[in-house]
Swiss-Prot record:
CDD domains: Phosphoglycerate_kinase (cd00318). Belongs to the phosphoglycerate kinase family. One of its GO terms (cellular component) is cytosol. The gene is pgk. Gene3D superfamilies: Phosphoglycerate kinase, N-terminal domain. Substrate binds at D24, F25, N26, R40, H63, F64, G65, R66, R122, R155. One of its GO terms (biological process) is gluconeogenesis. This is Phosphoglycerate kinase. It catalyses: (2R)-3-phosphoglycerate + ATP = (2R)-3-phospho-glyceroyl phosphate + ADP. It is an enzyme of class 2 (transferase). Transmembrane segments: none annotated. HAMAP family: Phosphoglyc_kinase. It comes from Prochlorococcus marinus (strain SARG / CCMP1375 / SS120). Its EC number is 2.7.2.3.
């Protein structure tokens, strides 16, 4: 069922109203406490700016880190409020706590178009327990609820799910709407052929995604460390490469399922090996049936890159989740960088390219190609769960489209 979004609300719905907006401001900080990547803050700007223009009173709720229900001075949202003030060109008032007298006072003093950022919602232990009393207190600060935190939508927490019981309307923000349009759209009604590229180190973390994508895709391309579990399941020697021995039967079952469904499941034909796990390790490129003892695979080989490029050439929709190798080490980044370049080229030809969260986003950004993709997801776990076909509590709780 489609969800109501901010675009469905009129000026009358928003002007002068106190609007609680759940955002994802869980940004990386360096040792000095400065933000090193403000992508998530920028991603929320369209929703915040729209509410300011419509003269709403904007109350932002966010989490940062994992303080485990206690105040942690290193996890306060002060750097976020400062950066947001710069981006908006106006003062963002931060509260001492997300509920209580200080929050109530600062919200009460708001004028139309003002922005208040509530302190880290996870400083309160009841947030992650989705406690109804805490949700009620948080909701009492506002009249309207907007969820724009796709990255936290897979959590049934008080600020993502509980507050919707006390606030109406409860709608999706622009970022949430865009995420659902691309990710849900790619799963439910894609332009075909639809391909998924799944990487990363472990089969175990992508079981649900692989099973779901084999059901929905025309082609599934597998890279990253998980390929060695598939190779070992085929009886090949994999040297010191990462293998999940308890997932060998699963790997066989996934290959069997793809074959039965007529889905093209592609594994690399060659790999780049290292003699140890380090950026300056000795390396060699070999066919997958020629991996010597004492060596480990850290990237897909050049032949495999060409194999994958050929498979993707006619695709109209491509979802990518997980790198092809240890792209953090330049010597083992070619597979991942080549896929980034290929997807950028496909985008230019009209293919819908979706980067489904996590390390693949970092890889595309490192390659300087993020702007060339159709959609870069801001959610790691949320993207995975949506691709698995799971219901996201933070989305399910929003009002259905009328």
């Amino acid at each position: 069922m489609a969800k109501r979004s901010l675009s469905n609300l009129s000026v009358e719905d928003l002007c002068g109203k106190r609007v609680l907006v759940r955002v994802d401001f869980n940004v990386p900080l360096n040792e000095e406490g400065s933000i090193t990547d403000d992508t998530r803050i920028r991603a929320a700007l369209p929703t915040i700016q729209h509410l300011i223009e419509k003269e709403a009173r904007v109350i932002l709720s966010a989490h940062f880190g994992r303080p485990k229900g206690k105040v942690n001075e290193d996890m306060r949202l002060t750097p976020v409020s400062q950066r947001l003030s710069e981006l908006l060109g106006k003062t963002v008032v931060k509260t001492e706590s997300c509920i209580g007298p200080d929050a109530e006072k600062k919200v009460h003093e708001m004028s139309n178009g003002d922005v208040v950022l509530l302190e880290n919602v996870r400083f309160i232990g009841e947030e992650e327990k989705n406690d109804s009393e805490f949700a009620k207190k948080l909701a009492s600060l506002a009249e309207v609820y907007v969820n724009d935190a796709f990255g936290a939508a897979h959590r049934a927490h008080a600020s993502t799910e509980g507050v919707t019981n006390y606030l109406s309307p409860s709608v999706a923000g622009y970022l949430m709407e865009k995420e659902l349009k691309y990710l849900q759209g790619a799963i439910d009604s894609p332009q075909r052929p639809l391909a998924a590229i799944v990487g990363g180190s472990k089969v175990s973390s992508k079981i649900g995604v692989l099973e779901s994508l084999i059901d929905k895709c025309d082609k599934v391309l597998i890279g990253g460390g998980m390929i060695f579990t598939f190779y070992k399941a085929r009886g090949l020697s994999v040297g010191k490469s990462l293998v999940e021995d308890d997932k060998l039967d699963l790997a066989r079952a996934l290959e069997k399922k793809a074959k039965e469904k007529g889905v093209q499941l592609l594994l690399p034909s060659d790999v780049v090996l290292a003699d140890n796990f380090s950026p300056d390790a000795s390396s060699q490129m070999v066919q997958i049936d020629s991996i010597p003892e004492g060596w480990m695979g850290l990237d897909i080989g050049k032949e495999s890159v060409k194999l994958f490029q050929d498979a993707l050439a006619d695709c109209k929709t491509v979802i990518w989740n997980g790198p092809m190798g240890v792209f953090e080490f330049d010597k083992f980044a070619n597979g991942t960088n080549s896929i980034s370049t290929t997807l950028a080229e496909l985008s230019a030809k009209g293919c819908c390219t979706i980067i489904g969260g996590g390390d693949s986003v970092a890889a595309v950004e490192k390659a300087g190609l993020a702007s060339k993709m159709s959609h870069i997801s801001t959610g790691g776990g949320a993207s995975l769960e949506l691709l698995e076909g799971k219901v996201l509590p933070g989305v399910a709780a929003l009002d259905d489209e009328i």
